[in-house]
């Protein structure tokens, strides 16, 4: 996942951990961390994962086509025809598409998306070689073992097993694996263009189950939206001069005052259908003082006390509004000279439905200084929209997750960073993060050192995908 390593940490805030004993009464989603997959499909998911981790698909290494070739061979061995699997190169990377024919070939297809690339890892910093899969103490260690080769492996193994068993979906099911989600998302954009006739996207790189310290599930998150990541460059210039002769203006002073205003400003709160569903679904597991505010805001977004309570908590402030904060500043050219220019970076996470240009204009209004220019820094992100919570999709998710963990709270939400879903939502295609990894918060090392996946999640994770697909495409 790009920019925000693991979206579940945003959808289920850390403050909810305090309430785990009251929320963890559902059946365990997995037995012990040492449990390895026992089913043929689960074992195949592990084999795919090991092969994928051993292929260092870091940007610039040219290994995405290599991994795509290995995936293609596996798909062919499961009964896919050669003309149903294609790889489209794009520079040193590319994307893979595999089409599983359905009964109605004219209907719009359902997509399963994941990404083959990973972020860099320095072997000297790791306890184990990050690109040599190691199974130890019930975990598989290696770069990408969690983000996102676990999701890719389980969804792929699930589909291959269904194909071998002769299952035929109601309409075409398409596997679409991108090759640069962690960097430019150029393959994602091209993939979304090529598959723009899709009816629905299921993203293996978002959503998932949260376990408490005892290994019991307390919530499952469904990603149905993303905040737009945006950086803005603020620039102010001044004639400068010798520091012994200060004038009426100073670029550092002007920028400091502007950044103080940005820091103090609160964007208007918003309540969308997704936010409302999240707050109502999360309130039962939240500490009492927060739960009341969540319910109150979901009922009345003008409730001042509820707004104040949620705004005061970093875990929640981003759920109810756009946030913008100063993150970098640079200026001056000599200790004894008045600064001729100062630049600052303001990072924003924009609420779905609000455009980057609207935020830029609001920031200009906030600082109220026409001498300071504000420029959006294009990093490939798109204005974000939410996916409607379709009854057929949410019903299928309920069935698949509750088969694995009866009674578990299923909470829709949005992530603070971008995934491949961004490009599909921008085309009006609903996308849902429905990852099948269940794990404890202290096991989440995506993008970090010693990234790992609990092996016990593989068997039930594959089964979750199969139930989801057979329910949606029956």
Where is each model-derived feature located?
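An extended, acidic, His-containing surface patch that forms the Zn2+-binding/catalytic region
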Residues: 105-107, 210-213, 217, 270-336, ...
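Histidine/acidic-residue-rich, glycine-tolerant segments that coordinate divalent metal ions
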Residues: 170-251
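Acidic/histidine-rich, surface-exposed loop or edge segments in extracytoplasmic proteins
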Residues: 46-57, 235-238, 375-383
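N-terminal helical capping/dimerization or prosegment-like subdomains
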Residues: 30-123, 341, 345, 356-357
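Second-shell loop/turn segments in exported
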Residues: 33-38, 53-62, 140-145, 220, ...
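Short amphipathic alpha-helices in soluble, non-transmembrane regions
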Residues: 249, 359-367
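Active-site metal-coordination/substrate-binding segment of hydrolases
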Residues: 107-177
